[in-house]
């Protein structure tokens, strides 16, 4: 699936990929969703899904294409007078599926999303997470090729959000289903996405693998999103600078990626140089592309020792930055 109507970049979403699109309110995320399902047409360029340009499709071709492009909504959009089973069956009924097939398919989907025992419950009897599971099951009913999730977890609490993300990841693995995930939360991207596009003012300003964007964000807005998961959104550093004795050496920010996250680097440097390194803050982050970590370290080294310590860190393939704004 390729879309290149927004901005100079041309993202390509491969089959079976979970692709995140992140941006703040007004960035153009909802417009992009409407382009992907043909509710809006681009002023120029094209939106190509499975070899078909959605923007140029006839009314009938677009109707057929939409059967394979499903939506999961932020506020569930369930029919409140219908049971769980009836809500899931609805999309099969309007596509002309026979009753016998509908019954089997509904039971299969209820098991897939973990709602066994809730078949006859009404939406008013369900929690927010259960309602979203019904929405996901309904979206999967016609075996779509693409699942569009528009802020599917933003109305949920953190624990339920993680449960829904795990469900989407499980569905992606079992069905090899392409998922496009619209969100304003970097936690959602980190948790399940393979690649991500960052939107600002109607344009895609940065795009790439999730791990790459976390470790080497290029745009200011991307760096702002990355800070969401680092615990210091409104500060330059994730610790209280007043607790640091600036006369006692330098403060280094170390970034570990992949194998370097598993090495006892600080312990080995302590033994080698006989210095009492002071760890000010540390965090380890897991993405679908791998693990990376950040450590802020006060190094009580002399002017002659510091270059050697930096060289040792580089030998471990650890990125270093001397923090000057403490």
From Swiss-Prot:
Residues reported to bind ATP: 23-30
Enzyme Commission code(s) on record: 7.4.2.11
Membrane topology: Peripheral membrane protein
Entry GO MF terms: ABC-type D-methionine transporter activity; ATP binding; ATP hydrolysis activity
Enzyme class label: translocase
Residues annotated as domain ABC transporter: 1-226
Reactions mediated catalytically: L-methionine(out) + ATP + H2O = L-methionine(in) + ADP + phosphate + H(+); D-methionine(out) + ATP + H2O = D-methionine(in) + ADP + phosphate + H(+)
Localisation per UniProt entry: Cell inner membrane
Keyword list, A-Z: Amino-acid transport, ATP-binding, Cell inner membrane, Cell membrane, Membrane, Nucleotide-binding, Plasmid, Translocase, Transport
Gene Ontology, cellular component aspect: plasma membrane
Complex formation: The complex is composed of two ATP-binding proteins (MetN), two transmembrane proteins (MetI) and a solute-binding protein (MetQ).
Record's function text: Part of the ABC transporter complex MetNIQ involved in methionine import. Responsible for energy coupling to the transport system.
Protein name: Methionine import ATP-binding protein MetN
Lineage: Bacteria, Pseudomonadati, Pseudomonadota, Gammaproteobacteria, Enterobacterales
């Amino acid at each position: 699936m390729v879309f290149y109507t927004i901005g100079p970049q041309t993202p390509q979403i491969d089959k079976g990929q979970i692709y995140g699109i992140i941006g703040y309110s007004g960035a153009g995320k909802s417009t992009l969703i409407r382009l992907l399902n043909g509710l809006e047409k681009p002023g120029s360029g094209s939106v190509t899904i499975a070899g078909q340009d959605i923007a140029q499709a006839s009314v009938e071709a677009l109707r057929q294409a939409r059967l394979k492009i499903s939506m999961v909504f932020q506020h569930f959009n369930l029919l409140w007078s219908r049971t769980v089973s009836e809500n899931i069956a609805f999309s099969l009924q309007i596509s002309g599926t026979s009753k016998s097939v509908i019954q089997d398919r509904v039971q299969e989907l209820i098991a897939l999303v973990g709602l066994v025992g809730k078949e006859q419950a009404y939406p008013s009897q369900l929690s927010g997470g259960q309602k979203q599971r019904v929405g996901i099951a309904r979206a999967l009913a016609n075996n779509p090729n693409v699942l569009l999730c528009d802020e599917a977890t933003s109305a949920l609490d953190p624990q339920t959000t993680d449960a829904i993300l795990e469900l989407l990841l499980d569905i992606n693995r079992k069905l090899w289903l392409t998922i496009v995930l619209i969100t304003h939360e970097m936690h959602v991207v980190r948790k399940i996405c393979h690649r991500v596009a960052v939107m600002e003012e109607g344009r895609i300003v940065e795009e790439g693998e999730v791990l790459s964007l976390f470790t080497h964000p290029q745009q200011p807005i991307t760096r702002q999103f990355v800070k969401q998961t680092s615990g210091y959104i409104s500060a330059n550093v994730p610790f209280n600078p007043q607790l640091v004795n600036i006369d006692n050496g330098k403060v280094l920010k170390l970034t570990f990626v992949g194998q370097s996250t598993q090495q006892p680097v600080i312990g080995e440097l302590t033994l080698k140089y006989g210095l009492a390194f002071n760890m000010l803050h540390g965090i380890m982050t897991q993405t679908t592309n791998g693990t990376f970590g950040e450590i802020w370290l006060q190094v009580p080294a002399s002017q002659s020792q510091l270059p050697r310590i930096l060289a040792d860190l580089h030998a471990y393939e650890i990125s270093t930055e001397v923090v000057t704004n403490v």
